[in-house]
Amino acid sequence: MKKRFPSTLFLFYRRVTIAISLEGILGWGWLGSLLSKVFAFLVACWNRFSWSTPYRARSTVISVGNIVVGGAGKTPTVLWLAEALRLRGYSCGVLSRGYKSQSSRQKKLTVVDSKVHSASYVGDEPLLMAEKLPEGSVWVHKDRRISAARAAEKFGILLLDDGLQYRKLHKDVEIAVVNGQDPLGGRAFFPKGRLRDFPLRLKTVDAIIVNGGGKEAGTVVKRVSNAPQIFVKPTIASVVWTHNGERIPKEALRELRVGVFCGLGFPQGFLNMLREEGIHILGKYLLPDHAAITKKELNYFCQQMAMRQGQGLLCTEKDSVKLPRLSGEVSLLPIAKVEMRLSVNQDDTLSLLNMIEQIHKNRGN
């Protein structure tokens, strides 16, 4: 008889990966300090000696990136920026490397089609962006010069996802996204902290998006960079049941008793947002960033939440595009995805868009 639940060994493996990726177990003690110093040294060498003339695309390239190992909010920022520019009459293409995807490993240029491609083939974030943006907007290739050259034939503006450390492509505008709850990644390189680049890298960007955290986070960032700051706050746009597409009314969220699973670089921000809406979180099942939950894990977590009288499970949109096929799984609790949007000050938005528009016009595009 086929087992419905994951093995003890697999659950132990999940626990270890979470301890490494989210709890920083590798950063403990003298070994963690040593590994962080080695990583910082390698980054410094890379920054100093790895240099080549960047390819200049025919279109304006806007880079959106960060200095930490995940969880800053790049994908929501790219989606917000693409929509804001669309409302100004600009069509935008998105360039992604497709982190850990089959297409990236095959070095194959892929224009993402959300109806055809899977998260394993193109990557979870490119697939999510393809669902949100007009058809043919998201391009995946490990070498962003190749995707930029092709996408420039169709789009006047290209958004380079996770591009802060990518030097092979010329960037007309650089935007850094920082997590307002930990803007400088614990001030230590991974694994002791969350940095993957030096905070002084923020000095060279054109704008900094402070994702949550408010003015206090802005003050911390101001100590290392005078770049203009734009404060954004992630909020719940809607909560949708995945099995029938029905939206849960906003006023009903405070009555929800659910379990939450997610694979994020900084899951605490997502959990805090749910709690602020009054959602009762009965339990959580955390995954490493970009990891997909398995059918056996869903069965296991659903059983736990059913014993606590849970009404269902919640996950992010990024997790929903990686859900396994669940046809015939009648024992599962219903799953709802949380659709988020960024709340941004209109004056800040206007200032950033005006800067981008001026640079775009100066290029003659």
Curated annotation (Swiss-Prot):
Keywords: ATP-binding, Kinase, Lipid A biosynthesis, Lipid biosynthesis, Lipid metabolism, Nucleotide-binding, Transferase. It is an enzyme of class 2 (transferase). It catalyses: a lipid A disaccharide + ATP = a lipid IVA + ADP + H(+). GO terms for biological process: lipid A biosynthetic process; lipopolysaccharide core region biosynthetic process. One of its GO terms (molecular function) is tetraacyldisaccharide 4'-kinase activity. It holds the Pfam family LpxK. The gene is lpxK. Transfers the gamma-phosphate of ATP to the 4'-position of a tetraacyldisaccharide 1-phosphate intermediate (termed DS-1-P) to form tetraacyldisaccharide 1,4'-bis-phosphate (lipid IVA). Pathway: Glycolipid biosynthesis; lipid IV(A) biosynthesis; lipid IV(A) from (3R)-3-hydroxytetradecanoyl-[acyl-carrier-protein] and UDP-N-acetyl-alpha-D-glucosamine: step 6/6. It comes from the Bacteria. Belongs to the LpxK family. This is Tetraacyldisaccharide 4'-kinase. ATP binds at residues 68-75.
